[in-house]
């Protein structure tokens, strides 16, 4: 059996929740992209309204009005978050000018975070996923966030999960 070399890391998917601690995981993505001459696809997923919430709002506003409001505002929200991601990226480059990288794409989706990350891995044909870990609740969710756990379990590509300082 011959040992193959580690594949190049040319396409990195950086999944972010845009929290204050997101910069820590992003620095790893920047460093890897810089070192291997790769690019970064940024992904932020907005969790969709629960089925209970959807039913409640529909019962109050009516189905047609609720669909109309969602359609009108959904793109505005996605565009605003995309702008926030661009600013986040520019700020990081200013803070670490010695570590330039290429931004391949900025993607904002609505849905289940783990599912959308896994879909984006396939769509972007990335070589590596970088994301932060921050569980909530019971022992910090057994030391890893539920989204990162689900992505690790099901992802076909390597996943680098960055523990946040003090976590």
Sequence positions of predicted segments:
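Structural beta-alpha unit
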Residues: 1-7, 49, 59, 83, ...
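General small-molecule cofactor/ligand-binding pocket signal
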Residues: 43, 105-109, 160
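Short, well-ordered secondary-structure micro-motifs
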Residues: 52-54, 118-119, 142
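Short, flexible loop segments at boundaries between secondary-structure elements
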Residues: 157-165
